[in-house]
């Protein structure tokens, strides 16, 4: 993995983002190793909260490591993190003083950024989701295969945005989550 990351950093790739699912008692002792990658390299390391989309229910084992704790642990090591302006639809992004790169936290489970979310996903089986935690799916695959007009497909997508819940908690409470894995959801 590090060899590939080094090759990417030596290439002409403009934006390199390294996603790390942070887990208590698994890799929480490596946070600073990941943050350290941003000291001399213009990359973004994004720490992602463990999400409840796994058939083995790992997230119920006490390994959940919330965004607030991730940030607090990083601050304890490097001092203040300077927030960077930008899209706050999926992550909080920061810069450490004198570091070339950036550090971000994606509160995927605590869902503190849902109010600004403008994202949708298309699942591996062609369903459109307006929230990771929603069961409200629109079958784009079948619409395309059945020669539904572009205008009607556009209307379906717009309708999906109009049906977004206020946040992921409301979406989950409304109808539960039936997908067992992020590989099914598209992430």
Which residue ranges define each predicted feature?
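Conserved C-terminal portion of the radical SAM core fold
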Residues: 1-57, 71-78, 125
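Auxiliary Fe-S-binding modules of radical SAM enzymes
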Residues: 36-40, 50-187
């Amino acid at each position: 993995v590090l060899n590939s990351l080094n090759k990417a950093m030596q290439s002409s790739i403009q934006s390199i983002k390294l996603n790390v699912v942070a887990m208590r008692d698994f890799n929480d002792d490596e946070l600073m190793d990941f943050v350290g990658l941003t000291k001399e390299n213009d990359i973004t390391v994004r720490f992602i909260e463990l999400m409840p989309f796994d058939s083995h229910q790992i997230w119920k084992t006490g390994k959940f490591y919330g965004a607030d704790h991730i940030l607090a642990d990083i601050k304890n090591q490097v001092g203040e993190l300077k927030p960077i302006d930008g899209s706050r639809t999926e992550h909080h992004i920061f810069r450490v003083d004198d570091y070339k790169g950036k550090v971000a936290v994606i509160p995927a489970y605590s869902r503190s950024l849902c109010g600004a979310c403008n994202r949708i996903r298309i699942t591996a089986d062609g369903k459109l989701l307006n929230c990771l935690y929603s069961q409200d799916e629109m079958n784009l695959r079948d619409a395309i295969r059945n020669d539904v007009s572009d205008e009607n497909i556009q209307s379906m997508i717009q309708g999906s945005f109009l049906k977004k819940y206020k946040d992921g908690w409301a979406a989950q409470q409304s109808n539960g989550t039936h997908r067992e894995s992020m590989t099914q959801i598209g992430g």
